[in-house]
């Protein structure tokens, strides 16, 4: 069994952050966590599908690197979607959580991509 098929999977639980929020931004009742995701996909078709999936959750910052700002439930759904798209024997996706402190200390040089920001909507 691979990790994304495990129904009891606790992927979003981090032993270093028992609260699981990495000092997260709060949007409504859901804390939003930032992740950097990079991939090395052998097959062109699979690579395109992975890029489209990640593009629906965040912003491309380099050819095979994305930043996403998602809640735990969305992160779990995204990981399951990505897992279904790759060949676990030849492809690799790495997901790095970014705590609020680390993200605030980030330095970008050259052409940069705006950090994804989710602001609450006010409907009148």
Curated annotation (Swiss-Prot):
<dbReference type="GO" id="GO:0004521">
    <property type="term" value="F:RNA endonuclease activity"/>
</dbReference>
<keyword id="KW-0255">Endonuclease</keyword>
<dbReference type="InterPro" id="IPR021127">
    <property type="entry name" value="CRISPR_associated_Cas2"/>
</dbReference>
<dbReference type="GO" id="GO:0051607">
    <property type="term" value="P:defense response to virus"/>
</dbReference>
<dbReference type="GO" id="GO:0046872">
    <property type="term" value="F:metal ion binding"/>
</dbReference>
<comment type="subunit">
    <text>Homodimer, forms a heterotetramer with a Cas1 homodimer.</text>
</comment>
<comment type="function">
    <text>CRISPR (clustered regularly interspaced short palindromic repeat), is an adaptive immune system that provides protection against mobile genetic elements (viruses, transposable elements and conjugative plasmids). CRISPR clusters contain sequences complementary to antecedent mobile elements and target invading nucleic acids. CRISPR clusters are transcribed and processed into CRISPR RNA (crRNA). Functions as a ssRNA-specific endoribonuclease. Involved in the integration of spacer DNA into the CRISPR cassette.</text>
</comment>
<keyword id="KW-0051">Antiviral defense</keyword>
<comment type="similarity">
    <text>Belongs to the CRISPR-associated endoribonuclease Cas2 protein family.</text>
</comment>
<protein>
    <recommendedName>
        <fullName>CRISPR-associated endoribonuclease Cas2 4</fullName>
        <ecNumber>3.1.-.-</ecNumber>
    </recommendedName>
</protein>
<keyword id="KW-0378">Hydrolase</keyword>
<keyword id="KW-0540">Nuclease</keyword>
<dbReference type="GO" id="GO:0043571">
    <property type="term" value="P:maintenance of CRISPR repeat elements"/>
</dbReference>
<keyword id="KW-0479">Metal-binding</keyword>
<dbReference type="InterPro" id="IPR019199">
    <property type="entry name" value="Virulence_VapD/CRISPR_Cas2"/>
</dbReference>
<keyword id="KW-0460">Magnesium</keyword>
<dbReference type="Pfam" id="PF09827">
    <property type="entry name" value="CRISPR_Cas2"/>
</dbReference>
<feature type="binding site">
    <location>
        <position position="40"/>
    </location>
    <ligand>
        <name>Mg(2+)</name>
    </ligand>
</feature>
